[in-house]
Amino acid sequence: MTPTRSPRRRTSTVMFAVLLLFIAPILARAALYAMSDDPRSWRDADWSSTGLLPAAADSTPARVIIFTGTAGAWKGIFSVHSWIVLKHANEPRWQRYDVVGWGQPIRLNNWPVDGKWYGNEPIMLADISGPEAEKLIPRIEATVKDYNYSQTGDYRIWPGPNSNSFIAAILRTVPELGLALPPNAVGRDFRYGFYAGRTDSGTGFEINLHGLAGLKLGWVEGVEVNLLGLVAGLDWRHPGLKLPGFGRIGVDLPVTTALAR
């Protein structure tokens, strides 16, 4: 007769898995932050341009660019901040959209389009140009205009809607990008109530309860488990491990430069 595990043993196994996958990485990130000289206040942070993008007048094609940067102060232990930059062909100025937690959530051109975020170098996730970008821009602009959480007081740092919830909402309207925000973009999984359906990239399936708990399985997302907005999982497309706080550890991700479909 095969012995069965006792309920106490099973509970201990689950608790150990939660500790190993969710709590330990956050404690490690907190320790690294405590030992760092990262700015603790926005007043001390560098918000200057990094020079990643040319002047809009020197870039003729339409472009859609998505950036992330480690969030400021203690929030950087848990999350990155995401924003989107776009321009129509021959337009003389970039348009940068962010969502923030004070005043009106949606902000236009409050910072340099390729600026550091709280002193942290931005990471470019996608850079679509030419006719493909021109095709996406009207839907992106419509999503910005119709965003459900655009009024003062709508912002919630956790579990959302926050800056990452905003960019995730945009990605859902342009699934041909085949893009997902990093696993440490806390708030990206926020959806009001219960959701079961396609992932943000359109390449998989997810179940989600208000961004607080969920499971994803997809080509772009890999395998992800969401617990209280923290994500652990595996990336099989570009092999890597996903851990709360650290995001993704593994093979470097290429910048998305063409539509997936």
Identify the role of each PLM range.
Residues 35-131, 153-157, 231, 236-249:
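Glycine-rich catalytic cores of cysteine/serine-nucleophile enzymes that process amide/ester linkages
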Residues 111-176:
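Mid-length scaffold segments of soluble, non-membrane domains
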Residues 2-46, 148-261:
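Activation targets extended, charge/polar-rich intrinsically disordered C-terminal tails
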Residues 94, 108, 144, 178, ...:
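Ubiquitin-like/PB1-type beta-grasp interaction modules and other compact soluble beta-rich domains
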